[in-house]
Amino acid sequence: MAKKTILDLRDEDLKGKRVLVRVDFNVPLKNGVITDDRRIREALPTIKYLMDKGAKVILVSHLGRPKGFQDDLRLDPVAKRLSELLGKPVKKLNDCIGEEVEREISNMKEGDVILLENIRFYKEEEANDPEFAKKLASLADLYVNDAFGTAHRAHASTAGVAQYIPGVAGLLMKKEIEIMGKALESPERPFICILGGAKVSDKIGVIKNLMNKVDGFLIGGGMMFTFLKALGYEIGKSIVEEDKLDLAREIMNMAKERGIQFLLPKDAVVVKEIKEDAPTSIKDIDKFEKDDIGVDIGPKTIELFREEILKAKTIIWNGPMGIFEIPAFANGTRKIAEAIAENRNCVSIVGGGDSAAAIQTLGLEDKFTHISTGGGASLEFLEGKELPGVAVLQDK
């Protein structure tokens, strides 16, 4: 990795120093209880490393999309869970800046951990307000960005603070960038990219950037219907982006010219209306009627994709194969996850978001090389964009 990480620092750079760590503790809550603590667990290596080196660790994160101060989005449940995981009390403050915060930090001992309040309670955070960033930076001697999930945002706590104090990457940030970077730069082949989700428009950048790198694309999810319609198929009332049909044709032609496989589904699970208990049927894609709605890939497609998955040496997967929130339409996503898990000879990378959620639901996390903690950030990374939260860190 071209950026400095905490591993590049000498012990004296950390011992007794105040270190502001941007983490991504944006975890799902139900009635004030954390339903999935993965993001907290992913941050532990960085936090423990800094504690062991005698740093005073000041954690900052957002949670949800608050409108000003909101009691139900305070970080108290996170501090409680983090304390349990570290086996050490984590003091949670009721603010991010100000006298009380400064006083608490001045009382910290080496190896102590403090969690500041939800940074998005301040609108200055998302505006990347320089004065606000300066106040945050004044709390510490060093900045560590370990929040890959927000690295694509230029906010005060993800980018702004690094204008005032030296910034380096944490261990999770390092892992994310190195694993995905290696897959893009020197993949073992065959290298396939599996894309799903509702919209082609969300994945255009990824397709274009990976067009020169992969051996094949496997396309599922709602976006498949834009490609199928572009080829002249009747898709009934399935989701389609009418304004992206020309672009879909252009992408398919580009793949053809370069000899890159571009696999579209052969069949789909079809309903007349999208609801939990809707009667389903399976249809080949050339048999759709005017009132059919495609909601998942069908068994022939699953088998076709599975064959390609089992041959692959590098796999990047982003986006579900159907409307997987509804159990009856989740089979395609489940079977693709199982096929990737079955291939023990490949590097498998899942780009956060819905695909990651599906894998967790299936309990297959340990069968994948890497499940990214960032949905939007991993997409932008795969698009070849420089992430603002990484760009501001010191070069090696």
Curated annotation (Swiss-Prot):
Record GO terms (molecular function): ADP binding; ATP binding; phosphoglycerate kinase activity
Subcellular location as annotated: Cytoplasm
Pfam family of the protein (one): PGK
Enzyme class: transferase
Disulfide bond annotation, renumbered to this chain: none
Pathway terms, separated by semicolons: Carbohydrate degradation; glycolysis; pyruvate from D-glyceraldehyde 3-phosphate: step 2/5
Subunit field text: Monomer.
UniProt name for this protein: Phosphoglycerate kinase
Species whose genome carries this gene: Dictyoglomus turgidum (strain DSM 6724 / Z-1310)
Gene symbol of the encoding locus: pgk
